[in-house]
């Protein structure tokens, strides 16, 4: 696969400690992808801070998935895809609504991306949900 670090960068939505959430500006496939990122290996650590942040990582993923199912695109998504990557010493969960695949992507690998203003609106709405975690 031809993934680059740019596929995991985007509009910063929320950060708490070492856990961060963004909306991709260069999605891999869909036009809307949420990245939830944490230091790699924290779930296996005995350190109290690592354990607390591992829990927060899981909670942030749940909030992102609920947002995709209930609010993004008017709550029309009935399912989602969730992928995990290790990149640059971090574990990144990439969450995206599951839609019928775009023929532009299948035939030409052209990803459809939302307008920046739409991404900013989604970022604000998702941030409000994530703020309830702390």
PLM regions: where:
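HIT superfamily nucleotide-processing domains
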Residues: 1-134
């Amino acid at each position: 696969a031809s993934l680059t670090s740019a596929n995991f960068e985007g509009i910063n939505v929320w950060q708490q400690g070492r856990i961060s959430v963004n909306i991709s500006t260069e999605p891999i496939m869909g036009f809307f992808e949420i990245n939830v990122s944490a230091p790699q290996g924290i779930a296996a650590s005995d350190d109290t801070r690592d354990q607390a942040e591992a829990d927060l990582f899981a909670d942030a993923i749940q909030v992102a998935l609920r947002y995709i199912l209930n609010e993004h695109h008017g709550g029309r998504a009935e399912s989602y895809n969730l992928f995990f990557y290790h990149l640059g010493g971090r574990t990144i969960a990439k969450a995206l609504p599951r839609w019928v695949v775009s023929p532009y992507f299948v035939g030409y690998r052209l990803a459809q991306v939302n307008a920046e203003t739409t991404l900013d609106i989604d970022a604000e709405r998702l941030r409000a949900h994530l703020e309830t975690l702390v």
